[in-house]
């Protein structure tokens, strides 16, 4: 038993999106009921009417549309919530019961996503400061240590205690002015004796009392009221109410289950966890701990420790939002109770679902944590669902977050990945859950460890999950320490973590050992082989770039993987997995049917989206295979069956591959032969030189599906029409349209082609004078519509794969004012080309600079050309040596025809084991194939390579290997852009920016300096006027260019006039003057009218260059 375990030290991975699912399940089973019950009963202001929600009996009705249908119709996949409510009239004793509709609740799909208005969205997990009490020490300006304690609730007022240099204890309520701590304690009704009995060092608190003098309870309450409500006459009753509502009213103040747990743990109290408000005992204990700190008893807290930060997942975020909605609902119900007649009231007339619906809609539609799902490939989808963000409501902001929050903390070990985080302003604020981490009932992150007894790892015992707090006082060894077959730790010294420090100890001292070497990193990072040989910065880029890999036409799994590819693909939900044992009875491109055999697991009795399940033997299960769906990122989602008719399948077997998967394993890129060598400067600065084979054989070809949409609206002048009759368009442009004016499926379209013909009625004002004259004379309506068709934008082309028509008659829900919506999907095959971005898994990214014919590529001794040439200088300074190991082991695998799975951190099998295994496999490849050139032990990893153009060998042997390279989603087709004329900004009249706006290239401040430095005055002048915002000048210039005349002299830029107007609007009399020389030789100061260019501009006094003709040139000679 143990020896088997030794061969397989890897611990089984948990379900990777369980964090989303279990959280939403908690919301449905507990969270929602908890909220409904906390608002029940609602009484009116007189107290004679009561409305009770019977929360635990709430019902969800069947969703209106299925997941697929909701996506197609642009609607939300949601269920209706009904709650039984009871209206009690205390005067008459009437009881009315009714089931009341309280709103739509979006449902989570089985893949952990939500479908909101037809788009798949993900709710990101938020990591926030846990409620509880925190102690911190500060050094004041005199160099004396002072301590402070903050009591932070889940919701409600903060309470902060602090000591000062005179040894007095102060308290602040909700960040207001300082108040003596004695006032608060006395106001709570505690006597001096009670206070002193609770303190370990009462003599310290005595100073505060001596300084302030004694307070009675009444005086204390008055003082409290004065401080919190300055300017109002203080009363004892007012003070009492103020205190009660601030800290002891469960509606206003809530520690939450977590807050109570943390408080009890820190202050060693035993208050039951149903008490969610403060007690006087809590406050006393907090003050006691604070005073003890002055005597060096106790410890201060580290805010960034994961024991003090907790995760709020979907369920809790949604619960908070429901609370907001119910708060608004409660107010409305109260008002209606007061206003309406008590006899005719029914629960249904009282409860208005709108506020709750609005709150939920707002959360899913516009919360910072509800994000459009990143669907580029399965890994991106998986990572997005496991993301942890410190931003969002109740979290941090980018500007406020310092370095400490962003930093890697020792408690992140096995909980948050230290590597995967964005580059840029969000670095460290957005992280990713580590592979084995899970969230416990309080929202703290836990990670599993194996127990160790007397230096022997107990593989026979279940792994223990521990939070960061529990793990602090234990000696924990990492997952890659060597053990023998009996589980004994090998070696005299073992590296361990103990109380946030990394140190070494003897094997006997170790308490626990991590379950797996990849436990500390996230899913994306654990897909990088030889991760331990890469610099962390490059591993970060590698993790982030794998998520940007485009799904290719023919996916190919890596020759060198890490063993997590299969689980990653399965949990992303992209592959179809058999739910039972059985026989395949039918397979085609769109469905797979399996006849069940054997016993069904009891849990699968529930029906899910994909095929209905009931546990009868011999029953068939249908699995739908999706074909060529468009993803959120315009990539193509396509599944293809892997099984044949008549095949036996077992539960959990992969039935169909999704995009970017092959054989049920993640396959983001392609294995290609790489040479590390410079080639004519084409791989300078990370550029990449590739072979034409990658283009011809469609190795890096991907399919992209673009969606174009147009709606025919109701306008003031009449409805817009979707039609084939478009004014001023020849029959040639219409040949692909059907009789309705919509493009037919299968048509090839290019930029500027009409996809949907649409005409808009135009009013009188839109017509030129000659048109008006004609209509006045002949009284005929020269067809008064203008062409408003949907055309293919610039730079796009492809084949129409789908057309969808939505009209009111068919019962589709359309946006207000629209009569009809047409959606056209255009697919394009994009081969790899110059300007596309490629990357490996080790952060080695580059842009393709040239595509060489196959015959010109450097070739190997057996005549086979390499596929890609990378710059060797990209390796040493970046310290991502993992790519070299990967490409050499890949070369061995390529030669032997095998694939390798290498778990990261393989040094547990001995020193330099990565190098040993690579050399060993290369040697094996050479011996098995009998080709001596494959591996030369004297110059390991290098091979003599020949120049494809001349056939000469290159000067030196070159590192050759097979690397796994990805094509990233940053494609040149989406970025390349040019503008001749186009739209201008309204105020400044300068061209807009960006490809989407058909914008121009910004000629910024520094570029202006460059031209100034060269004295290129005329070039600069036309850049700042004619080419930008001199309105009249640019029209004249265009006219001149068209007619072949000289370009006239530029006028005044519009932005200068805007500046003038702005200064004038401040009341400054500012004007432009110029000096004119008069006929008699005297000069005169003339004000320039900047609005004069509305009149015809006078031609400038300057030599005009008529366009030179050939004759005049001949004359000169």
Curated annotation (Swiss-Prot):
PROSITE patterns noted in UniProt: RNA_POL_BETA (PS01166)
Pfam family, one: RNA_pol_Rpb2_1
Any GO CC annotation of this UniProt entry: DNA-directed RNA polymerase complex
Region feature (Disordered): 1094-1117
InterPro entries assigned to the protein according to its UniProt record, in alphabetical order: DNA-dir_RNA_pol_bsu_ext_1_sf (IPR042107), DNA-dir_RNA_pol_bsu_external_1 (IPR019462), DNA-dir_RNA_pol_su2 (IPR015712), DNA-dir_RNAP_su2_dom (IPR007120), DNA-dir_RNAP_su2_hyb_sf (IPR037033), RNA_pol_bsu_bac (IPR010243), RNA_pol_bsu_CS (IPR007121), RNA_pol_bsu_protrusion (IPR007644)
GO biological process: DNA-templated transcription
Enzyme class: transferase
Domain of life: Bacteria
Record-stated family: Belongs to the RNA polymerase beta chain family.
Protein's recorded name: DNA-directed RNA polymerase subunit beta
Native species: Trichormus variabilis (strain ATCC 29413 / PCC 7937) (Anabaena variabilis)
